């Protein structure tokens, strides 16, 4: 029979390490949006009979998250408006033009959160300022942050996923071209992958 002797000091050390690990996990964490694994997607009704879908190909930003108090979550994100892609070149050029996003004058779409509220386990309602076409309006994102962090398989720190949805009225942002052909309400879905260095 093999007996394993454990001293009281070893037990105390293990407890301290566990407590410190928990404390570290509870600290506010800043995550970077990974543009290579993030999609800012939108959909809009065309003639009231079909749905046109597209996305912006380039997004960046940061998310600050406190596991012990998710209501302290803050988000800052920037989208390159010129990267709009609906898979139809003529339509994409029109979306970049003064008819819609006017990307030469307003090259970015930005979001900056102002408040976060719990909406259930792993769920948040994040209120913030959305700026499109040079106009800023308050919107609420329904956020699913139930994903748990994992170790990057390439050894580059930690990764975590999140998603968010909202809808906006393009008229609120001064975009009124082709009313009656393209619906005013736009559905937005964000699928985000976040990264941060491992401690």
What residue ranges belong to the model's regions?
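Bacterial N-terminal signal peptides that target proteins for export
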Residues: 1-13
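Bacterial N-terminal signal peptides
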Residues: 10-22
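Low-complexity, acidic/polar, glycine-enriched regions of mature
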Residues: 24-199
